């Protein structure tokens, strides 16, 4: 009997198209050999072309989900994605504190890949002041980092200043993702006063639905397995590159990645 499987919890929204949110997180965690659990913050009606509806769960039900997970299968790492309201953020912060959760990775999801807004304005301050200080790592893209830092980011030097400002304000490590609107796939990790660049080539693939969810859940999976943060980020970036390079082509808009591109099994056969 296998007793030593590592575990991770995704606290995020559900994506009906399966490319982002908890669906992407569960695929990613499973691909890393980690047992995935979820606490759903919202149901979304979305596909590769956009978000058409969001149905938020109640704070009480989110609280019940978190209690159910933490009192039974305690997660080795926690990834937090889409949380659209201040009330839900407060529930998460309280439960993570009460249960002394470890290896918390926050992906401050504010806008979907399609451009649809995913968080209420009043929730941003709650995210900043109640959730980010609990994080081991926060993984903003450039627009999100501009909101969190209050700075305009137009070059790598701006990225370093913004990452430093976020880290010093909220006392967490920051992985600032440069691929959003800079012409490269270089990401910056700022931790304990030190900047580390992760250089990457931009893969010519328009199907990038769920890349942020996937990267943060890959990092959380690696932390759950005992990796140091820098190694966890490096490994997660390699995984993302592989998933993008697999060139899955589904949907009419920005399609999903192949999260299981490296899964080799006699039970899996290629579709003709």
Where are these regions (language model features)?
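Conserved N-terminal subdomain of the carbohydrate kinase-like
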Residues: 2-10, 30-106, 110-113, 117
């Amino acid at each position: 009997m296998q007793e030593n499987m590592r575990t991770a919890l995704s606290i995020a929204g559900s994506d009906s198209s399966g490319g982002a949110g908890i669906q992407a997180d569960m695929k990613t965690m499973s691909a890393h050999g980690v047992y995935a659990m979820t606490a759903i913050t919202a149901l979304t009606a979305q596909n590769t072309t956009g978000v058409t509806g969001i149905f938020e769960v109640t704070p009480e039900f989110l609280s019940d989900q978190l209690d159910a997970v933490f009192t039974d299968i305690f997660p080795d790492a926690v990834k937090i994605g889409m949380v659209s309201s201040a009330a839900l953020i407060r529930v998460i912060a309280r439960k993570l504190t009460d249960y002394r959760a470890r290896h918390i990775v926050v992906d401050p999801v504010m806008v979907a890949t399609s451009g649809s807004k995913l968080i209420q304005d009043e929730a941003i301050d709650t995210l900043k002041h109640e959730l980010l200080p609990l994080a081991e790592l926060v993984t903003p893209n450039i627009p999100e980092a501009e909101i969190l830092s209050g700075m305009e980011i137009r070059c790598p030097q701006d990225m370093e200043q913004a990452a430093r400002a976020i880290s010093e304000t909220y006392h967490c490590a920051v992985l600032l993702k440069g691929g959003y609107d800079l012409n490269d796939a270089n990401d910056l990790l700022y931790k304990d006063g030190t900047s580390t660049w992760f250089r990457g080539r931009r893969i010519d693939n328009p199907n990038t639905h769920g890349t942020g969810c996937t990267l943060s859940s890959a990092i959380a999976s690696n932390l759950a397995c005992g990796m140091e943060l820098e190694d966890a980020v490096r490994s997660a970036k390699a995984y993302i590159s592989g998933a993008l390079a697999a060139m899955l082509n589904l949907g009419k808009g920005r399609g999903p990645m192949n999260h299981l591109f490296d899964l080799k099994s006699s039970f899996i056969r290629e579709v003709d």
